[in-house]
A protein has these predicted regions:
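Short helix-capping segments at alpha-helix termini
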Residues: 1-2, 26-30, 50-57
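Amphipathic, non-transmembrane alpha-helical secondary structure
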Residues: 15-18, 22-26, 43, 47, ...
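Hinge/beta->alpha junction and helix N-cap segments in small-molecule ligand-binding domains
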Residues: 1-20, 35-41, 64-68, 84-89
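Conserved beta-strand scaffold positions in the cores of enzyme catalytic domains, especially
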Residues: 4-7, 60, 81, 129
Length: 148
């Protein structure tokens, strides 16, 4: 049997993520997976898991490919980091703006008046998933970003 626990809000505060995670582990010592969906969550989750002596036992999934999160993965406290493909945000935006102004594609004779543009309404650039298997490549990417 598996029990799914309620969502706990750390309010994007590392210290709160730490205290919430520590309390969660104390109340549910057999918890199998903890996921943090805010960039600040991992910075509190990993130390709490480590302090409880549960590194590697509790699977940790974090959001945002940050240096601190990479350290958690490297040491084995976290197993997965999910991050946006930020490198392509700018190029996609520029291409979209260019297409709106220069594509020559129209749907009606009054596209501009009707708010119709030759571009997608939503763009999903996708995600990167960092694991031990691709750690070295993703770590190099993070270190290159730090130089900018």
């Amino acid at each position: 049997d598996m029990e799914v626990l309620p969502v706990f809000d750390d309010e994007a505060v590392v210290a709160k993520a730490h205290s919430v995670t520590a309390a969660l582990i104390q109340k549910h010592p057999d918890v199998a997976v903890i996921a943090g969906f805010d960039g600040s969550s991992g910075g509190g989750i990993c130390p709490a898991v480590r302090e409880a002596g549960k590194s590697g036992t509790i699977k940790v999934v974090m959001n945002d490919i940050l240096p601190a999160h990479m350290e958690c993965l490297k040491e084995g406290t976290a197993q997965y980091i999910v991050g946006q493909k930020r490198h392509i945000f700018g190029p996609i935006a520029l291409q979209t703006l260019y297409d709106i102004n220069h594509s020559g594609i129209s749907f009606t004779e009054r596209d501009g008046e009707l708010g119709i543009y030759p571009a997608p309404d939503k763009v999903d650039p996708g995600f990167l998933v960092v694991t031990q298997d691709n750690f070295e490549d993703m770590d190099a990417m993070v270190k290159n970003l730090e130089k900018l």
